[in-house]
Design a protein with these regions (language model features):
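Canonical P-loop GTPase G-domain recognition
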Residues: 132-186
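Inter-motif core of Ras-like GTPase G domains
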Residues: 76-99, 114-116
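Conserved C-terminal guanine-recognition region of P-loop GTPase G domains, centered on the G4
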Residues: 96-150
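Conserved G1/Walker A P-loop phosphate-binding module
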Residues: 1-45, 56-57, 61
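Conserved catalytic network of the ASCE P-loop NTPase/AAA+ motor domain
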Residues: 48, 57-61, 82-86, 114-119
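Conserved beta-strand segments of the P-loop GTPase G domain that flank and frequently precede/overlap
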Residues: 67-69, 91-96, 124-129, 156-158
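Short glycine-/polar-rich loops that comprise or flank the Walker A/P-loop
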Residues: 4-5, 86-89, 119-122, 150-153
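Switch II (G3) loop of P-loop NTPases
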Residues: 60-77
Length: 186
């Protein structure tokens, strides 16, 4: 019997959520991208206004991730709140090429902590665009997590690379399975 996991990808507009889903989805990605209008247009031509959706069967064939990419713009926060409901896992993408990526990531972490996210959801932090801006590094992001009272895996990610995206999703899957097994055996 196939077990499904709802996983959402969150992060600012342009952080690679749509690209990551497209790089690994086994189905044609359902997308609600529209032509960007406001300040986003300087960074990219389109922006997600609803959500992106793709599917990935975890190697072994018994588990599937249903991947949802959330809009990154503040005005679409309500969509992120809706998509977070019932999520088993979250992949938070931190854009290292922003002027103050740590402050921006702190803001996302606080939004996740105060939103409708289930308390037992597994989170993983993927740092994108390290090829453009190598700092802050992983250790600085780990320090930020500790300051926020959080502890979860942190890794670099090139959202264009199916291998890297799959690697991070496998790490997330292992965390989900471990949590599920602890639940069963406790």
């Amino acid at each position: 019997m196939m077990k499904d996991y709802k996983v959402i990808l969150v992060g600012r507009s342009g952080s690679g959520k749509t690209t990551a889903i497209r790089s690994v989805s086994e189905i044609n990605v359902v997308s609600t991208d529209v032509r960007a209008s406001d300040r986003v247009v300087a960074e990219k031509e389109t922006t997600t206004v609803g959500f992106d959706y793709g599917e990935l069967t975890i190697p072994g064939g018994q588990n599937r991730m249903r991947l949802y990419g959330t809009p990154g713009q503040e005005r679409f926060t309500f969509m992120r709140d809706i998509l977070e409901l019932g999520s088993a896992g979250i992949l938070l993408l931190a854009d290292n090429h922003r002027p103050d990526p740590l402050a921006e990531t702190r803001s996302w972490l606080q939004a996740l902590k105060s939103g409708p996210l289930p308390g037992n959801a597994i989170v993983l932090l993927g740092i994108v665009k390290c090829d453009l801006s190598p700092l802050p590094d992983i250790e600085q992001y780990q320090r930020l997590l500790r300051e926020e009272g959080l502890c979860f895996p942190v890794a670099t990610l090139d959202a264009r690379s199916p291998e890297r995206v799959l690697f991070l999703l496998k790490v997330l899957f292992c965390q989900l399975e471990r949590a599920r097994n602890e639940e069963v055996y406790s």
